[in-house]
Amino acid sequence: AIKWTCDGSPEFTIEEVDKADRGSDIILYIDDDCKEFLEEARVSELLKKYCSFLPVPIAFGKKKEWKDGKQVETTEDNIINDTTPLWTRKPSELSDEDYKSFYTKLYPMSDEPLFWIHLNVDYPFHLTGILYFPKVKSNIELNKNKIQLYCNQVYVTDSVEGIVPDFLTLLHGVIDSPDIPLNVSRSYLQSDSNVKKISTYITKKVSDRLQSIFKNDRKQF
């Protein structure tokens, strides 16, 4: 096996070692000012935020169960993520209840959405996602930053200005695309050709859905 070692500087060492079992072991050493990342609750919080929909299973400790009035660990791995979230599946496989349940999972304290749009395009850019029209009772509930941006099912941010048009940022839901550049300024983002195409596509899908409801269900509209 190969052992890679680094102390945090640009330099590192690589050496051959004996290893009895298959797989990779990653050992991290935490500085004193970062000890919060050794706390189970903190690690669980970060995994839940960024890795809830990672495409590979993540085991974090063992499952627990109540026994004799207290929680005890079992021998079963505690898988903390959903590897096939709704937006990665075909709309034909999903029911209205599936969409509503997923919305409740994302926004536990919200009322059921009015309706939703399932996004799925592979060319000329890759984009998947689900956008929900929330039930809004007052202006106070018109909160932005409710659309979550993912890249290959890894959470990135809930600030999608420059990607989703401003007049649509009141929607809720998820968009996932590996074609959106990360860690760049908003002005650069708005000038990116793929981002422009994605923004136009989302606007058209929302417009088409609203137009369809207007024609076929005027009362709901």
Locations of the language-model features?
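GHKL-type ATPase core
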Residues: 1-69, 78-79, 151-154
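Conserved, well-folded catalytic cores of nucleic-acid-processing
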Residues: 49-57, 109, 170, 174-181, ...
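A glycine-rich phosphate-binding loop feature that marks nucleotide/adenosyl-phosphate handling sites
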Residues: 63-68, 119-123, 188-192, 220-221
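GHKL/Histidine-kinase-like ATPase module
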Residues: 41, 69-175
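Short acidic (Asp/Glu) and glycine-rich catalytic loops that position anionic groups and cofactors
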Residues: 3-6, 23-29, 77-84, 146-152, ...
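Extended, well-ordered alpha-helical scaffold/bundle regions in very large, multi-domain proteins
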Residues: 182-220
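Short loop/turn segments at secondary-structure transitions that flank enzyme active sites
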Residues: 32, 137-139, 181
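Cytosolic catalytic headpiece
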Residues: 22, 101-102, 211
